[in-house]
Amino acid sequence: MRFKKGNRWRGSKGQIRYKTWRKMVFERNKGRVGLSKYYVCVKCNKKRKTTRVLHAHHIFSWNKFKSKRYDSKNGVVLCVKCHNGFHRKYKFEALDKPDLLVEYLNGDKAVKSYIRENK
């Protein structure tokens, strides 16, 4: 993700924190399926050796839940197709309702547990 100076520029400190958060989400994902050399989309279970075609998605929205922005447990790995599918299906409604992600992920237990603990 590249940041350009402008109305969305947050400064380099935020960029470093975001990259660190993203890396932690991906590393946590590797252990989730017991295949330490693969990253896996939690929706479709496609395995990838690199993160190029994968996104780290916030469970609790970046905009609405500022205190959870950099919590590594507040993220799941989705492939580009599944990530775009989630946002196409729920649009801005998902910003306030993290439970919609659980619905989209067919009741993912880890995500459901994190939401329950942090509401």
Annotate each PLM feature.
Residues 72-81, 108-119:
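Short Fe-S-cluster ligation motifs
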Residues 58-64, 94-103:
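Short cysteine/histidine-rich metal-coordination sites, predominantly Zn2+-binding motifs
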Residues 38-40, 53, 76:
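Residues immediately within or flanking Cys/His clusters that coordinate Zn2+
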Residues 60-74:
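Short linker/helix segments within small regulatory modules
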Residues 43-44, 81:
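Short, cysteine/histidine-rich loop/knuckle motifs that typically chelate Zn2+
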Residues 2-43, 67-69:
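Short, charged surface segments at domain edges that flank catalytic/cofactor-binding sites
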Residues 49, 75-97:
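Short Cys/His-centered divalent metal-binding micro-motifs
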Residues 54-62, 80-86:
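Histidine-centered catalytic micro-motifs
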